[in-house]
Amino acid sequence: MLVAARSAGLGQLRGYLVADLLSRYSERTGLTPTVIDLLPRREAELRAACAELNIYPPRHTLTLPVTGEQLAGQFADGIREPVFDVGVRAAGEPAELCFPVGIDQPAAEGLAGHWIEVAGAGNGTAGDTEATSGERLELGAEPAAVRLTLMRHGYGETLGSGPQPGAMDADSARKELARWRELVARWARSPSGPMSRRYADAVTAAFADDLDTAAALREMAALADDAGVPDGVKFETFAAADRLFGLDLARDVGRY
């Protein structure tokens, strides 16, 4: 599966996070995803910031089935065969700005089989790409808390307003992340058991439902507080779900 990702607010990273989550889910279903950015900007900084937020950085080169000139020619002749399975772009961003080839807007729309439009921040443009890594990570001292903050919102939902988009719930995200990591570390000491199919399936279903990460996180919160589920089962379920979330929830195992 080929995914073309472009900047989508919060200094590029929100769009790449969406592509990352889509890739993680695709791998779970047996696909082999490749995320690329054909128009990289500030590549070194982007890769560093992606690493901080546990986002697989996009590739910046790809051998396409045809050259840019051939693409333009094909679309000029009315051929509409998508090159990419999914395109990720900022809400309102013209599709032609996502590709380094001289094709018009209708043709560019047809290059991806499906487009995901990612909302930006309430106090800036959706396609803002100029935030520094430090500005991005002011949302939380823990980069994973920034990731969690973003996942609490649907990708089409505009983040909060003010000088620090999303700051309204960054503190609660830090606290919840710390709590979950401590719980996972404590659960790891209990006898292991098969993961809860009920909660695991609910998380997977939420991802399948238009990448509804907010609903998936609510399922995990419910599992954490479910007294009827043994601790060892909670551990296995959280560990499996974290392959989708990418929050490093098992980081503190062995510390408690």
Where are these regions (language model features)?
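Short, mixed-charge aromatic SLiMs
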Residues: 43-51, 174-183, 241-251
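Catalytic adenosine-cofactor/nucleotide-binding cores of aminoacyl-tRNA synthetases and other
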Residues: 75-201
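Short, well-structured alpha-helical interface segments that form or flank functional binding sites
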Residues: 17, 175, 215
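N-terminal Rossmann-like or analogous alpha/beta NTP/dinucleotide-binding catalytic cores
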Residues: 1-130
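Short helix-capping/linker segments at secondary-structure and domain boundaries
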Residues: 27-33, 153-165, 227-233
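Short, histidine-centered active-site or binding-site loop motifs used for metal coordination
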Residues: 3-7, 150-154, 224
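Helix-rich, typically C-terminal accessory recognition domains appended to large enzymatic cores
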Residues: 205-255
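Structural motif
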Residues: 11, 134-145, 167-170, 206-214, ...
